[in-house]
């Protein structure tokens, strides 16, 4: 185990673990899938060597007035029953001589919608109760379906951990600490690792060569059904050539607009609080000024003064709402915007590649 002083700089995931996570998340999609990951910390690199899913446990409501729909799978990592289950699984893995150090948990996402209170509370629980050097692996199922694997590793920043522990997310506290929505997560680079035996096996696989040059296929379907693709397991993945832009981009834009609308709602609520606070503060100041004038007149008449702190019983200042939800929503807006930007930039190259076939009178150069 690496020393505590060495900061985590990267995450190395075994290919078998990646396949197990992909299988679990795909089978439960669109329901959230969560599980535990084990491995070891080697000189600042978190090596993940095994994983197992969490059973879904019903979480009790926090209060009788909590009418929100529960999400047992998303809250499973911090459930008490799953904590016992995880400890028992790690004990059994240790008995068969497998790396059995708790290094975090994984969760599935859809369109990058992982910035929420469940993920925050789960990761806070792991970094505070389990092991400070733990990560959350996020596998985006819908993004991976576009042809490229989406697997990211996150930790909560020390600044956010301190603020979440104190539960101080007022505007004044955020200004003092300098905490921004960009400071919620710390992302670590992810590297997928294969064993030397698997790498050697892949290099020894025979790849048939084409005996003679063939004509270019007229469509992607013809390319995928060609004899070269059917005869070898090392055929390239043609999902990256797909031009189905509308579904993914349209859904991302819808989610982005919803998040912006939520952000505007949070802003309006905070502005309403500020107006209410200013109105009540004005009433208090007027009452105090009136009481001071009354005490001054009573002093001239040699009468005892009236208490000037009686306003605390007569007036009640509104409580400032927490800015945590607004911060999470701002971080989610940034996530959706980055996804749209990355998807459009990747698709632009494809559009230029097929420009000659789309526009009459032009040929690809």
Swiss-Prot record:
InterPro entries: eIF3h, eIF3h_C, JAMM/MPN+_dom, JAMM_MPN+_peptidase_M67A, MPN. It comes from the Eukaryota. Residues 11-160 form the MPN domain. PROSITE patterns: MPN. Keywords: Cytoplasm, Initiation factor, Protein biosynthesis. GO terms for molecular function: metallopeptidase activity; translation initiation factor activity. It is found in: Cytoplasm. Belongs to the eIF-3 subunit H family. Component of the eukaryotic translation initiation factor 3 (eIF-3) complex. Component of the eukaryotic translation initiation factor 3 (eIF-3) complex, which is involved in protein synthesis of a specialized repertoire of mRNAs and, together with other initiation factors, stimulates binding of mRNA and methionyl-tRNAi to the 40S ribosome. The eIF-3 complex specifically targets and initiates translation of a subset of mRNAs involved in cell proliferation. This is Eukaryotic translation initiation factor 3 subunit H. It comes from Aspergillus terreus (strain NIH 2624 / FGSC A1156). The lineage of its organism: Eukaryota, Fungi, Dikarya, Ascomycota, Pezizomycotina.
């Amino acid at each position: 185990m690496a020393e505590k002083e060495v900061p985590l700089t990267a995450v190395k995931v075994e290919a078998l673990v990646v396949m197990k996570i992909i299988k679990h998340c795909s089978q439960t999609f669109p329901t959230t899938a969560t599980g535990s990951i084990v491995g070891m910390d080697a000189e600042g690199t978190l090596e993940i060597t095994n994983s197992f899913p969490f059973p879904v446990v019903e979480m009790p409501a926090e209060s009788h007035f909590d009418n929100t729909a529960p999400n047992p799978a998303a809250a499973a990592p911090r459930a008490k029953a799953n904590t016992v289950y995880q400890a028992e699984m790690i004990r059994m893995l240790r008995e068969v001589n497998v790396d059995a150090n708790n290094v975090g948990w994984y969760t599935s996402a859809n369109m990058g919608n992982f910035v929420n209170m469940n993920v925050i509370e789960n990761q806070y629980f792991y970094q505070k109760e389990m092991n400070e050097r733990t990560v959350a692996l996020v596998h985006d199922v819908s993004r991976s379906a576009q042809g490229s694997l989406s697997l990211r590793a996150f930790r909560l920043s020390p600044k956010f951990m301190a603020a979440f522990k104190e539960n101080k997310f007022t505007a004044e506290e955020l200004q003092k600490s300098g905490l921004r929505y960009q400071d919620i997560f710390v992302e670590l680079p992810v590297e997928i690792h294969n064993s030397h035996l698997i790498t050697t096996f892949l290099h020894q696989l025979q790849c048939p060569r084409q005996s003679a040059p063939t004509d270019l296929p007229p469509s992607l379907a013809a390319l995928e059904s060609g004899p070269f693709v059917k005869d070898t397991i090392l055929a390239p993945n043609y999902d990256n050539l797909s031009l189905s832009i509308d579904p993914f981009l349209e859904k991302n834009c819808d989610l982005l607009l919803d998040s912006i609308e939520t952000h505007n709602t949070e802003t309006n609520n905070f502005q309403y609080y500020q107006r209410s606070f200013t109105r009540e503060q004005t009433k208090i100041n007027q009452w105090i000024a009136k009481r001071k004038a009354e005490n001054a007149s009573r002093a001239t008449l040699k009468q005892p003064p009236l208490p000037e702190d009686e306003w605390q019983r007569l007036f009640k200042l509104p409580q400032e709402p927490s800015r945590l939800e607004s911060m999470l929503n701002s971080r989610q807006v940034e996530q959706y915007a980055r996804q749209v930007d990355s998807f459009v930039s990747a698709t632009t190259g494809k559009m230029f590649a097929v420009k000659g076939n789309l526009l009459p009178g032009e040929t690809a150069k």
